[in-house]
From Swiss-Prot:
A zinc finger (C4-type) spans 269-286. Belongs to the TFB4 family. GO terms for cellular component: core TFIIH complex portion of holo TFIIH complex; nucleus; transcription factor TFIID complex; transcription factor TFIIH core complex; transcription factor TFIIH holo complex; transcription preinitiation complex. This is General transcription factor IIH subunit 3. GO terms for biological process: nucleotide-excision repair; regulation of DNA-templated transcription; transcription by RNA polymerase II. The gene is Gtf2h3. Part of a TFIID-containing RNA polymerase II pre-initiation complex that is composed of TBP and at least GTF2A1, GTF2A2, GTF2E1, GTF2E2, GTF2F1, GTF2H2, GTF2H3, GTF2H4, GTF2H5, GTF2B, TCEA1, ERCC2, ERCC3, TAF1, TAF2, TAF3, TAF4, TAF5, TAF6, TAF7, TAF8, TAF9, TAF10, TAF11, TAF12 and TAF13. Component of the 7-subunit TFIIH core complex composed of XPB/ERCC3, XPD/ERCC2, GTF2H1, GTF2H2, GTF2H3, GTF2H4 and GTF2H5, which is active in NER. PANTHER family: GENERAL TRANSCRIPTION FACTOR IIH SUBUNIT 3, TRANSCRIPTION INITIATION FACTOR IIH TFIIH , POLYPEPTIDE 3-RELATED. It is found in: Nucleus. It comes from Rattus norvegicus. Component of the general transcription and DNA repair factor IIH (TFIIH) core complex, which is involved in general and transcription-coupled nucleotide excision repair (NER) of damaged DNA and, when complexed to CAK, in RNA transcription by RNA polymerase II. In NER, TFIIH acts by opening DNA around the lesion to allow the excision of the damaged oligonucleotide and its replacement by a new DNA fragment. In transcription, TFIIH has an essential role in transcription initiation. Keywords: DNA damage, DNA repair, Metal-binding, Nucleus, Transcription, Transcription regulation, Zinc, Zinc-finger.
């Protein structure tokens, strides 16, 4: 029991709040809306905090022009509601309850609801960049995990994982930043899980495969909560004892640097490893001039002259 108390489990949930994708869902009169998605996320967050008093939580909204922490909020501090009553907000009573609700979870739900409402009402779409800033959200999650690991006591161990709830399509423009974040997470032994609502994500498939996480495309979006609790609530140690969805085939195609499109066969710069779909004598990334190798020229053999007698 002491070993469990000395181990901290930090779960960072990244929610895709792309207003264009969720707006299309509303136009389709779909039963699954952003508010229902956030309800499922908050149930997962509450269940994670209930699993152990030392469990920690963070929720990030991945928007089209920014990445914002929904929990802890703007006034939150590292350690708020994380099993440390000394760091709780003044208005929160850790041992009390209100209307049958646990105060810490009630405060967390209120903070998340307030932040997501503020984000969606104040969002202003400018320009043609309407892709979700997923790579930036993952980088922010890694920074938060690194900061949380510095606050861990010497006799404690912290295990961290990131859950991405993806809605909109992938952005090939973020390919390089995305791959850098994936390898940084792998180096820090941080799992990246992915729960995809709509079309498959090749980038998240690679992220889950490289870091050892789980990738799941939800068959029915209204059943999101059941899949979150079944697949993504258990941590890495508990998953080995459960029957989980089988692994999927990973799309390892790379995005070219010239058009940002996924390709199967391309040209790679031998200096900076940039990938291009068409041959270019000069690398546009590092400006290296390539030597074009021509087929070897075969010299004609000299005919031996016969000596006349």
């Amino acid at each position: 029991m002491a070993a469990d108390e000395d181990e901290l489990n930090l779960l960072v949930i990244i929610v895709d709040t792309n207003p264009i994708w969720w707006g299309k869902q509303a136009l389709k009169e779909s039963q699954f809306t952003l508010s229902k998605c956030m309800d499922a996320v908050m149930v997962l967050a509450n269940a994670h905090l209930f699993m152990n008093r030392s469990n920690q939580l963070a929720v990030i909204a991945s928007h089209i022009q920014e990445s914002r922490f929904l929990y802890p909020g703007k006034n939150g501090r590292l350690g708020d509601f994380f099993g440390d009553p000394g760091n709780a907000l003044p208005d929160c009573n850790p041992s009390g309850s209100k209307d049958g609700k646990y105060e810490l979870l009630t405060a967390a739900n209120e903070v998340i609801a307030e932040e997501i409402k503020d984000l969606m009402t104040k969002s202003d779409i400018k320009g043609q960049h309407t892709e979700t800033l997923l790579a930036g959200s993952l980088a922010k999650a890694l920074c938060y995990i690194h900061r949380a690991s510095k606050a861990v006591k010497d006799n404690q161990e912290m295990k961290s994982r990131i859950l991405v709830i993806k809605a909109a399509e992938d952005s090939a423009l973020q390919y390089m930043n995305f791959m850098n974040v994936i390898f940084a997470a792998q180096k820090q032994n941080i799992l990246i899980d992915a729960c995809v609502l709509d079309s498959d994500s090749g980038l998240l498939q690679q992220a889950c495969d490289i870091t050892g996480g789980l990738y799941l495309k939800v068959p029915q979006m209204p059943s999101l909560l059941q899949y979150l609790l079944w697949v993504f609530l258990p941590d890495q140690d508990q998953r080995s004892q459960l029957i989980l969805p089988p692994p999927i085939h990973v799309d390892y195609r790379a995005a070219c640097f010239c058009h940002r499109s996924l390709i199967e066969i391309g040209y790679v710069c031998s200096v900076c490893l940039s990938i291009f779909c068409n041959f270019s004598p000069i690398c546009t990334t590092c400006e290296t001039a390539f030597k074009i190798s021509l087929p070897p020229v075969l010299k004609a053999k000299k005919k031996k002259q016969k000596v006349s007698l």
